[in-house]
Structure formats: C-alpha cells, structure tokens
Amino acid sequence: YLLISITLFFCSCHKPKTDIITPAKQLIERQIGERAQSIHFEYIEPSDGKDIFEVIASDGRLTLRGSSSVAICYAFHTYMKEACKSMKTWSGEHITSVMPWPDYELYEQVSPYELRYFLNVCTFGYTTPYWDWERWEKEIDRMALYGVNMPLATVASEAIAERVWLRMGLNKEEIREFFTAPAHLPWHRMGNLNKWDGPLSDAWQHNQIALQHQILTRMRELGMQPIAPAFAGFVPEGFVQKHPDTQFRHMRWGGFDEEYNAYVLPPDSPFFEEIGKLFVEEWEKEFGENTYYLSDSFNEMELPIDKEDKEAKYKLLAEYGETIYKSITAGNPDAVWVTQGWTFGYQHSFWDKESLKALLSNVPDDKMIIIDLGNDYPKWVWNTEQTWKVHDGFYGKKWIFSYVPNFGGKN
C-alpha cells in the first residue's frame, strides 16, 4: 500500500541543528544535474512546529526556502509542477529545467501536519522485496519531493530476528524454516504466514542488512523519521517445542494449512517482553537509535477465544496491548508503538468499540500511533463507517489518516 498522512516534528531556533541545505541540494542535483547550482537555498524556521516553505523566482533567479530538507525538496517539486510543467510520479517522470527560471511566487506555505507517512507493511511484498539501492534511492527522492517525512523501513527484519532467535537458543535450521520467501515477508511479519517458499539464504540476510544501512542513512540525512520493525509475539515452531509449558495460541489466516500458520505467545509470558527487548536492542545495535516501532499482532486474524465471553476477551486484549508496548519500551524507553488500523475495519465485527478500547487501555496516549489504513475501504468494501469515526478518533491515541491509492502499483 502507498500512503500519505499525520502527527509530530522538531524544535525551532534561529538556525537548524543539522545541515538541511546540503541533502536537499544533492537530491535536486539528482533530478536536474548541474542546473541545481543556480538555485539559491535558505533555511526558515518552522511555524509552530509545522514545516513551512517558500518559492521565489524572479529575473531568472530561483530561491527555495524551507524549514527542513524535505520542505525544500517539496518546494522544488511544487515549483517544477506549477512553473515548469514538470513532475515526478510512480508511472513516469517529466523533469525539464526551463532556461531561465520562470517567474513565480509562493509565500509561507505551512503544512497542516507534522508527520507525513508513506508505505505500509505490504508494500514490502507487493512491490519492493527485490529492490536494490539504485531503486530505493529513487523512491526516497520521490518521498522527499512529495513531502514525506515518516517512511516505513522494515528491510532486514529477518536478519535482526535471526540474531534474536539464536540468543533464545534456536539453531539456524529452526530459525530459517520459520521465514517465508521475500515476497511473502510482510505477512510473515504480521503472523499470517510462516515457511511458505522459504527459507532465506545467508547472502540474502547479509545483503538486506547492507541495503537497510543505505536506506536509513539517506532517510536520516533528509531529516525523515523512519518507522522500524518490532516483535509482534509470533515465534518459530522450534521455540514452541522447546517450551511445552507455555500456552501458545495457534493462529489461522487465509486458508493456509496449519503448518504455515503462526504461534503467538500469551501476553503473560515473560518471553514476550524478553524477546521484544532483544529485538529492539539488536536493531539499534545495528542501525542506531530510533523512536517509532511498528508491531502488528492481529492483522486479519481473530484470537482463538470464546467470543461469547466478552469480559475474558477484553481482559486478554488489554493484556496484549500492554505487553506489546512494554516489550518495545523495554528495549528503548523513548520508543513509540506504531500499529496499523487496517484490521480494525477489515474485521469490524470482532473489533467493536469495547474490544479496541481494551487493546489501547494500558498504553499511554502519547506513546502510540495508529495508522488508519484504507479510508477509501469502509464505505465501499466493508460497508461500515470510516474506522476513525466508528472508534471516536481512537480514544485519545495519536492516529494517521491514510488512503490506499494502489496495491503495490499492480492495479
């Protein structure tokens, strides 16, 4: 899925803490070459924490002003579209640098949103699993040109998970049989599917680590705040066999045979927080500190519980919500749990008001963000109100309004 959206940003002062001009200029050079040398760049302070940009072109001189690298890149793309009739899209690009720069003025354009989100878990299966750095560089450039400053970054999740499972006593064979082929990894990460078309090779794991370093370095150079993966509670079959006293729940999804479905830890298991902590620590040891961590434990699946026992259901969901949050912050106390809201609409009969309230009840409001995926779906596909309306703006939690303009660019 490909998305855009809302929520948070930096401080303001008379000059930025980091160089925002150089990354923006380098990105623009990748679009128009040496012509970028003729552009004048200036920093301006954010407006009440929100990004701001200006464009001034007069007598052949083009000035781009912005409060961040992304704001300057967005200013450039706005100018190219409106003054030069050029643009960069997923379906093609037409970038022409008109000589001299056409006159144009656009003052004090303030973003209404502090964070603008892009991508979701499934994009990494539909579209990106075999991308190399050259292709990722183009996409990150496009993100900045469109104003994105909060991209999802889940490449190399399995390489980190492998390190964690080794520390938890599994061998490589037990770990590798857990993973799917690359194009199915998004659903593996959400606990929908294991083993299918796997395993992954040593070369794959090594190359994904190297690629993720390139991706994160560029995102951070541009001032973006990537969302990293976190542990969602799903464990390899080898781990289940080693711990027969733990009451794992066997999940079902998509009509796949039982051997391909996931086992999830109970929320009261001490392993949950231990593994979640290790995952965040191993990720940050490899890639550096991060703030936002994505964990999806119930995507398109229902917990195998008695639906008629409402109180037991609410209690279990509250315990899961608290445990997922604690498993992330055990590894980084400053972390924020991010989760997708797709399944709350997709399975609206399971996720009634009280059920979602229960899941969120033990997580601080400022330590969670819900990505309200697919706002074009409730009315036309699920025959419900938009999920954020059904759930009263997610009961005080921060949330991101999102659309699904296409499924991986394939239709």
Q: Where are the model-predicted features located?
A:
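Stable alpha-helical elements in mature extracytoplasmic
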Residues: 20, 24, 72, 76, ...
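Second-shell loop/turn segments in exported
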Residues: 61-66, 125-130, 202-203, 311-312
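Short helix/loop capping segments that flank catalytic or ligand/cofactor-binding pockets
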Residues: 72-75, 128-129, 227, 380
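Bacterial Sec-dependent N-terminal signal peptides
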Residues: 1-18
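Catalytic-core regions of glycoside hydrolase
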Residues: 36-38, 87, 91-102, 119-123, ...
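Active-site-adjacent substrate/metal-binding segments within catalytic domains
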Residues: 113-132, 143
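Contiguous, structured surface segment used for ligand recognition
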Residues: 13-113
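Catalytic and substrate-binding clefts that recognize carbohydrates or anionic sugar/phosphate headgroups
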Residues: 107, 131-134
